[in-house]
């Protein structure tokens, strides 16, 4: 705004202010004069009451009119849509206000473009995030939108009603026992391993917090719960495999690591027998295949040598024929010995 515009604006505002002051001063003369005359009359009390009452009524009526006007103005604004932005001269006659509104709209537009995609991955507790919203530095282990609370409940119900995390053992416990009671009975009371006891206590504490706290389950809590469950499963599996291995003879070449992939302890012996049978059959078949290949090579070499000898038969004498016949007989003898030796190996 130029200097002349500012001078005109402040002159206008100053004139309005002075006019209001004179209006209030002239309006106050009448009630003051009325009160003064009433106080000097012969009936002071009645006159004063009438004058003061009239002034009070006038003030109350003015207040009612002002409040009513404000309420009516607010009711009119309710009909205006909330997303409506007053940016025209009709809506906002004051140009400075319109410019502020326009600048705010432009700034909001720029910020919405900048922050349309969050800077960090958005991971809400209680459910596994989709791959597009997950942290790329973390390996995707669980399926998308997995409900942590439902998964923990299913694990607890399986252990409670079936007595197992996996099909490695059977527990005969009271059906009224809780998940915590069963874990405590199996891994704390009847166990001497200190590490297993500590992890079982952590599992019980974490389970009660996740199930009954009412707070959403975070990914870290769920992963820790699953790790504790897997630890107890591996302990149970190893324990039962060790018990079954004691049933085998001492000369059996077994190691616990061969069964660390979830092999059922009750099927170890049958699988061992099947493995031995497979090994014997495989070895015999391999020897037979090698023997057949050797015999085929022998026949092919013999035929080639006989062909060469026949081609040379026309250019040699009788003495050479006898030498050739003797060499052929020696070759047949050596071939028969090779065949007998491989047959002996197969029988063994």
Swiss-Prot record:
Location in or out of the cell: Membrane
Bilayer-crossing regions: 15-35, 48-68
Record's keyword annotation contains Transmembrane helix: yes
InterPro entries membership: DLT1
Extracellular side of membrane: 36-47
UniProt superkingdom: Eukaryota
Cytoplasmic side: 1-14, 69-348
Membrane topology annotation: Multi-pass membrane protein
Function comment: Required for growth under high-pressure and low-temperature conditions.
Stated name of the protein: Defect at low temperature protein 1
Originating species: Vanderwaltozyma polyspora (strain ATCC 22028 / DSM 70294 / BCRC 21397 / CBS 2163 / NBRC 10782 / NRRL Y-8283 / UCD 57-17) (Kluyveromyces polysporus)
Encoding gene (name): DLT1
């Amino acid at each position: 705004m130029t200097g002349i515009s500012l001078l005109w604006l402040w002159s206008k505002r100053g004139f309005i202010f002075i006019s209001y002051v004179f209006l209030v001063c002239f309006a106050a003369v009448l009630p003051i004069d009325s009160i003064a005359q009433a106080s000097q009359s012969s009936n002071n009390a009645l006159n004063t009451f009438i004058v003061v009452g009239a002034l009070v009524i006038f003030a109350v009526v003015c207040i009612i009119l002002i409040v009513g006007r404000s309420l009516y103005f607010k009711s009119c604004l309710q009909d205006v849509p909330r997303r409506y932005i007053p940016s025209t001269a009709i809506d906002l006659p004051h140009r400075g206000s319109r410019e502020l509104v326009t600048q705010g709209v432009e700034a909001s537009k720029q910020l919405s473009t900048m922050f349309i995609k969050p800077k960090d991955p958005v991971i809400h507790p209680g459910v596994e995030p989709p791959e597009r919203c997950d942290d790329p530095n973390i390996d995707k282990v669980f399926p998308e939108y997995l409900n942590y609370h439902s998964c923990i409940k299913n694990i607890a119900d399986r252990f409670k009603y079936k007595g197992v995390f996996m099909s490695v053992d059977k527990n005969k416990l009271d059906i009224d026992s809780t998940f915590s009671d069963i874990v405590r009975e199996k891994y704390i009371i009847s166990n001497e391993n200190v590490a297993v006891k500590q992890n079982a206590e952590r599992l019980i504490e974490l389970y009660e917090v996740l199930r009954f706290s009412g707070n959403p389950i975070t990914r870290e809590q769920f992963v820790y719960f699953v790790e504790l469950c897997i630890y107890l499963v591996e302990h149970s599996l190893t324990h039962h495999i060790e018990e079954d291995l004691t049933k085998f003879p001492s000369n059996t070449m077994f190691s616990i690591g061969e069964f660390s992939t979830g092999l059922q302890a009750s099927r170890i012996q049958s699988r061992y027998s099947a493995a031995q049978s497979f090994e014997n059959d495989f070895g015999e078949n391999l020897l037979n295949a090698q023997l057949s290949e050797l015999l085929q090579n022998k026949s092919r070499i013999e035929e080639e040598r006989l062909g060469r000898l026949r081609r040379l038969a026309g250019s040699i004498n009788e003495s050479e024929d006898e030498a050739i016949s003797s060499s052929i007989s020696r070759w047949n003898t050596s071939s028969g010995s090779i065949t007998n030796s491989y047959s002996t190996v197969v029988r063994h």
